[in-house]
């Protein structure tokens, strides 16, 4: 009896293992009932419950204006194309600005001519610039080398062939030093008065002994090349 039970148990186990397995690919999920799928917009096509974009359904992107939106009129140089203002250069060949109405235009000054509401400079109206002095203005006398022409002082080189400055009157002129000679109130250097420059030492001043290559002449050290035929350190 025990043997029959074991055989039956083995047979049942074989039947259970022989049952075909269910693949995940064979499992299908049905959509929930009563679920509304929204319609697909432009450029999209509904495939099952999914919206797939199809470029051929929207060859170019365009945006329509909101309904009942007032489009302002286009200004100068622009033309309305649909709801857009497009600039057309032929509608405005040149930029010009009209003055405000009832605006007084001041008269144009010298060298200028009024053209409409604009002052245009005309060189022929002012061949040379000149400025007249204020009336009743005293003009100071011109100095040396200058000649008064109208209200202006003009420099004339022939009136001052050489520049010279006279000293102030009653000013003591110090005596000229060595190598200089007094000419009027000026000291002029004369090289013949100082053929060689030499400086005498102060009295009672000890003169240090001269170093190599030098020989003492009076109170001065004079360099003698024969005393140092080659430089050595």
Curated annotation (Swiss-Prot):
Species, as recorded: Antheopsis maculata (Sea anemone)
Keyword ATP-binding: no
Cystine pairings recorded for this chain: 40-51, 43-58, 74-85, 77-92, 108-119, 111-126, 142-153, 145-160, 176-187, 179-194, 210-221, 213-228
Origin organism lineage: Eukaryota, Metazoa, Cnidaria, Anthozoa, Hexacorallia
One Gene Ontology term, aspect cellular component: extracellular region
Cellular compartment(s): Secreted; Nematocyst
UniProt keyword annotations, A-Z: Cleavage on pair of basic residues, Disulfide bond, Hydroxylation, Ion channel impairing toxin, Nematocyst, Repeat, Secreted, Signal, Toxin, Voltage-gated sodium channel impairing toxin
Primary localization class, coarse: secreted
Source taxon at top rank: Eukaryota
Name of protein: Delta-actitoxin-Amc1a
Ubl conjugation found in the keyword field: no
């Amino acid at each position: 009896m025990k043997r029959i039970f074991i055989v039956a148990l083995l047979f049942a186990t074989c039947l259970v293992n022989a049952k075909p397995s269910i693949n995940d690919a064979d499992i299908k999920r049905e959509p929930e009932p009563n679920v509304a799928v929204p319609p697909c917009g432009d450029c999209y096509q509904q495939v099952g419950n999914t919206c797939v974009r199809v470029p051929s359904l929207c060859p170019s992107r365009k945006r329509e204006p909101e309904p009942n939106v007032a489009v302002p009129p286009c200004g100068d140089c622009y033309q309305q194309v649909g709801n857009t203002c497009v600039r057309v250069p032929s509608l405005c060949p040149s930029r010009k600005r009209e003055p405000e109405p009832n605006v007084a235009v001041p008269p144009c000054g010298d060298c200028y001519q009024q053209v409409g509401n604009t002052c245009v400079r005309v060189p022929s109206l002012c061949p040379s610039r000149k400025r007249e002095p204020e009336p009743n203005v005293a003009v100071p006398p011109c100095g040396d080398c200058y000649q008064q022409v109208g209200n202006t002082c003009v420099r004339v080189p022939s009136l001052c062939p050489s520049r010279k400055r006279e000293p102030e009157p009653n000013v003591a002129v110090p005596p000229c030093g060595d190598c200089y000679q007094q000419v009027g109130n000026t000291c002029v250097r004369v090289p013949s008065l100082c053929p060689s420059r030499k400086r005498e030492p102060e009295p009672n001043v000890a003169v240090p002994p001269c170093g190599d290559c030098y020989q003492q002449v009076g109170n001065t050290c004079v360099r003698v090349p024969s005393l140092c035929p080659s430089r050595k350190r």
